[in-house]
């Protein structure tokens, strides 16, 4: 028989995370590595755990993630959104709680493109009066 699992996709900046929630005892695997091993920072670990802590689902699910692109902060944000969306599929009653906390909103902020004639997105070359 097929195992029950809930899927969620999260994106943030250039990062894309595919998250699977499987009924279990709260194990975290990100790209086949543990949470602390993958991120190495307590703050990023906290960001990833937020939806589970808010909904009191920490010991109910094993979290399996595949994430690629971007940096560590973007990846943590993408995983958080993926977990929140997967939790929603597991229990639709969690929607108001997750929505109020802002975990179901995709953060639209991304790197602004560089413009020609400038050194970066907005940084202009040094101006000399004389």
Swiss-Prot record:
Keywords, A to Z, come to: Ribonucleoprotein, Ribosomal protein
Bias class Basic residues marks the residues at: 111-130
InterPro entries found in the cross-reference section: Ribosomal_Su5_D2-typ_SF, Ribosomal_uS9, Ribosomal_uS9_bac/plastid, Ribosomal_uS9_CS, Ribsml_uS5_D2-typ_fold_subgr
Return the GO cellular component terms, semicolon-separated. Answer: cytosolic small ribosomal subunit
Under Pfam families, the record lists: Ribosomal_S9 (PF00380)
The record's annotation in SUPFAM superfamilies points to: Ribosomal protein S5 domain 2-like
GO BP annotations of the record are: translation
Annotated spans, Disordered: 109-130
Q: List the disulfide bonds.
A: none
Q: Write one Gene Ontology MF term.
A: RNA binding
State the family named in the UniProt similarity comment for this chain. Answer: Belongs to the universal ribosomal protein uS9 family.
HAMAP family reported in the protein's UniProt record: Ribosomal_uS9_B
User: Which protein are we looking at?
Assistant: Small ribosomal subunit protein uS9
Q: Which organism is it from?
A: Heliobacterium modesticaldum (strain ATCC 51547 / Ice1)
């Amino acid at each position: 028989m097929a195992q029950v699992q809930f899927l969620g996709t999260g994106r943030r900046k250039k990062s894309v995370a595919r998250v699977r929630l499987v009924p279990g005892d709260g194990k975290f695997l990100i790209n086949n590595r543990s949470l602390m091993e993958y991120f190495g920072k307590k703050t990023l670990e906290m960001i990833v755990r937020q939806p589970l802590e808010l909904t009191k689902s920490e010991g109910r699910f094993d979290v399996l993630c595949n994430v690629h692109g971007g940096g560590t902060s973007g990846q943590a944000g993408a995983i958080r959104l993926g977990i929140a969306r997967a939790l929603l599929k597991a229990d639709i009653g969690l929607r108001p709680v997750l929505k109020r906390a802002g975990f179901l909103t995709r953060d639209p902020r991304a790197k602004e493109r560089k413009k020609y004639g400038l050194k970066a997105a907005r940084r202009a070359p040094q101006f000399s009066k004389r």
